[in-house]
Curated annotation (Swiss-Prot):
Monomer. ATP binds at K270. The keyword Nucleotide-binding applies. It is found in: Cytoplasm. The keyword Cell membrane does not apply. SMART domains: DALR_2. Pfam families: CysS_C, DALR_2, tRNA-synt_1e. Zn(2+) binds at C29, C211, H236, E240. This is Cysteine--tRNA ligase. Its EC number is 6.1.1.16.
């Protein structure tokens, strides 16, 4: 079977044929670094890491570009509220995202561009759009530059919308739009905000412009796959596609979108107060178990978080792991160069069917345990080799250097219980307004590498890695 993926633009599963034989160019909308990542953010990273690994297994050289949005309204708002420079917010949260990706075993990108390093490319893209009649400079002297959505006949094709039914673009203080649906390419300088010079006046880039400029710089005017969360289809990806194609670029040939991580049926987000940070979860389960949890559903499906489903995923992974470790001990070292079974490959070839692929893996565990019970060590070893190959493709190989010796979930539980007791004592001290004791407890925890953050929902703690 050839590789097939669901393409958002055509709304059908299509055979995948790369632009260049043997090479796949892949762009993923990465972090907007106004806050540390929650597990919903990282689900997208895990989904496309599995895609990348499968493409590599199939023999493709993958050029993977994952951007960093290091300047936007939210970052500026956080910086203002904290009384710090905007780049301090960006850098702090960029490091948190990088650590989260690494913790969950995501391969590093081929290139990871930051928006503020690509202002010249953005200016050139705006110039092309203005020259072609698809963008205009605001007439009020503000320095704003907007994309004229009525000038581009295909606007709305990615998100399957009709222009006349669209709502106004959410650009905040839109000062001189010709049409309320037009979106900002460039935001003219405002007092106290960072700005960069352009032929149309100083300012800073709009979110959509950033991604188009970075994607085409590193992957070319036409590339294979553009990925991201389904919540980005409109307006972000619609606007990316429109401005790039209107400028004369072919842009993405396939659009792949992962489903959302929800909790109680609602999208997980910091604004709703229902987000869970990576360190919170990895105190309950190991990082590899969290990776299994985030990657187990089909990438296009929503995944509703619950403590029960997290525990079930951890137990499911442990069944795979325990069999491999047992075979490795009984039958000798398991090789890491065995092909995956055909039914596993067929599942991933068909729009990255991870649930079906995992079913094949778990069937191997059942067969392997039966072989061990019968004393058939050679057959068990063969099954173990195939299982290891499957888990390696999914980034879950328990015998790999990434995950070997990571069985410390029990220790996490103990540490969590002990820290919770100490934090209860600190909360009691705060209630008594004994702030000296509360501060001393916090400082003592900090000396042990445990950082405490007081939130409206109560204290949170994080184990700082040295």
């Amino acid at each position: 079977m050839s590789l097939r993926f669901y393409d958002t633009r055509t709304r059908q599963v299509r055979d995948f044929v790369p632009l260049r034989e043997g090479c796949v160019s892949l762009y993923l909308c990465g972090a907007t670094v106004q806050a540390p990542p929650h597990i919903g953010h990282i689900r997208s990273g895990v989904s496309f890491d599995i895609l990348r690994r499968w493409l590599m297994y199939r023999g493709y050289r993958v050029i993977f570009c994952r951007n960093v949005t290091d300047i936007d309204d939210k970052i500026l708002n956080v910086a203002a509220s904290e009384g710090v420079q905007w780049w301090e917010v960006s850098e702090r949260n960029y490091r948190a995202f990088a650590e989260a990706y690494d913790t969950l075993g995501c391969l590093p990108p081929t290139v990871e561009p930051r928006a503020t390093g690509h202002i010249p490319e953005m200016i050139e893209l705006m110039r092309r759009l203005i020259d072609r009649g698809h963008a205009y400079v605001a007439e009020d002297g503000s320095g704003d530059v907007y994309f004229d959505v009525t000038s581009y006949a295909e606007y709305g094709s990615l998100s399957n919308q009709r222009l006349e039914e669209m709502r106004a673009a959410e650009d905040g203080d839109a000062r001189a739009k010709r049409d309320p649906r037009d979106f900002a390419l460039w935001k003219g300088a405002r007092p106290g905000e960072p700005s960069w010079p352009t032929p149309w006046g100083p300012g800073r880039p709009g979110w959509h412009l950033e991604c188009s400029a970075m994607a085409t710089k590193y992957l070319g005017p036409t590339f294979d796959i553009h990925g991201g969360g389904v919540d980005l289809v409109f307006p972000h990806h619609e606007n990316e596609s429109a401005q790039s194609r209107a400028a004369g670029d072919g842009f993405a040939r396939y659009w792949l979108h992962n489903g959302l991580l929800t909790t109680g049926g609602e999208k997980m987000s910091k604004s709703l107060g229902n987000s869970l940070l990576i360190p919170e979860i990895t105190r309950r389960v190991r990082p590899v178990e969290l990776r299994y949890y985030l990657g187990q559903a089909h990438y296009r499906s929503n995944l509703d978080y619950s403590e029960e489903s997290l525990r079930e995923a951890a137990s499911a992974y442990q069944r795979l792991e325990n069999f491999l470790v047992r075979v490795n001990e009984i039958a000798g070292p398991i090789p890491d160069d065995v092909p995956v079974p055909e039914e596993f490959a067929a599942a991933l070839d068909d729009d990255l069917g991870v649930p079906q692929a995992l079913a094949v893996a778990h069937n191997h565990v059942r067969e392997g345990n039966s072989a061990l019970a019968e004393g058939a060590k050679e057959r068990a070893a063969q099954i173990g080799a195939r299982l290891r190959a499957m888990l390696a493709v999914l980034g879950l190989d328990p015998l790999s250097p990434q995950w070997a010796g990571s069985d410390d979930s029990g220790l996490h539980d103990v540490v969590d219980s002990l820290v919770s007791v100490v934090l209860e004592q600190r909360q009691e001290a705060r209630k008594r307004k004994d702030y000296a004791t509360a501060d001393r407890i916090r400082d003592q925890l900090a000396e042990m590498g445990i950082a405490v953050e007081d939130t409206p929902q109560g204290p949170r703690w994080e184990l700082k890695r040295s």
